[in-house]
Amino acid sequence: MKVIFMGTPEFAVPTLKKLIAHHEVTAVFTQQPKAKGRGLSLAQSPIHQLACEHQIPVYTPSTLRNDKTINLINKVNADIIVVIAYGFIVPKAILDAKKYGCLNIHPSDLPRHRGAAPLQRTIIEGDKTSSVCIMRMDTGLDTGDILMKEDFDLEERTTLKELHNKCANLGAELLINTLVNIDNIVPIKQSSDGITYAHKLTKQEGKINWQDSAYSIDCKIRGMNPWPGVYFSYDDKIIKILEAEYLNVDHHFTPGTVISDKLEIACGSGILQVKKLQQESKKALNIEEFLLGTRILKATVLK
C-alpha cells in the first residue's frame, strides 16, 4: 500500500519504521526544524531524520490549511494517510484526499482522554487500564470511528516513559494489522458515554498541593516527568521531585510537614517518600546527595 505519513516526535518513529518495512511511504510531512540547544541551531524532528535516512521526500509546511499544501497532497500518489502526533489540525480536504482516508494512532481507551495529552492524563488520573486505538479521522477532536483496538493493564507505578514506549510499539503493530485487514474491518462508532478530554499540560499544574493524597501526587510525578515536572518551593527556590513513593498510612500532621530527616512529607492522606530531586538550574540528585547540600529540617511545613 502507498502511504503518506504525517508525524513529528519520537512516539511516531516505530510506526514509520514499520511502514517503511511493510509498505511504500511516498511522502512524509513533519514539523519544521526548531531551534535547539545553547547555540539555537535548527534541529530536525525524529521523523524528519528517519525519512531522510530512507530517502523519502519530506515536507515541512507551516500549515495544512492552504491550497498549496492541499494540492501537494492531492498530487502525491498514495492510498492512505497515517497521522501520528503531527502537531497540526488536518482539514477535511486532506481527510478525504485518499481512498482510505486518514488513520490515526491514539494511545487511550477512546472516548476517554481525547485530546493532546492522553499518555500523561492516563497516569496522572491513576488509570489501571488503557488502550491503543486505530481511528479513522474525522473533523472532530479524536471522535472518529475505531478500526482496531488493543486493551492492556497498566503495571503498578508505570512511568510516562514506560507508557510512551509501550503505546508507540503497540500502535505500530496494530496499524500494520489494520492495513492488512482494512477492506474487511467494520468501523465501530465511539461511545457517547465516558467522554473525557486530555487537555495539554501547563506548568502551573506541576505545583504540588500538599492537601492532595500522597497517591495522587505520586501519579502526577510519574505523569509529568520530564515536563512540566512536579515541584514545590523552599527557601525561595523551585525544587522538582523526579521520583517518589507513597505510603497509605494515617497521620496527624499538617499537610506539607516534613516528618523525617529523609524528606518524608505528610500529605492530605498518606505520606510521600521523596527519592530523587532537582533544584532549578542544577543537576538531578538522589535524596541522600540532595540533603548533603540542602537541609530541609524535620517539622518544616512546605508550601
From Swiss-Prot:
Signal peptide: none annotated. GO terms for cellular component: cytosol. It comes from the Bacteria. (6S)-5,6,7,8-tetrahydrofolate binds at residues 108-111. Keywords: Protein biosynthesis, Transferase. Attaches a formyl group to the free amino group of methionyl-tRNA(fMet). The formyl group appears to play a dual role in the initiator identity of N-formylmethionyl-tRNA by promoting its recognition by IF2 and preventing the misappropriation of this tRNA by the elongation apparatus. This is Methionyl-tRNA formyltransferase. The lineage of its organism: Bacteria, Pseudomonadati, Pseudomonadota, Alphaproteobacteria, Rickettsiales.
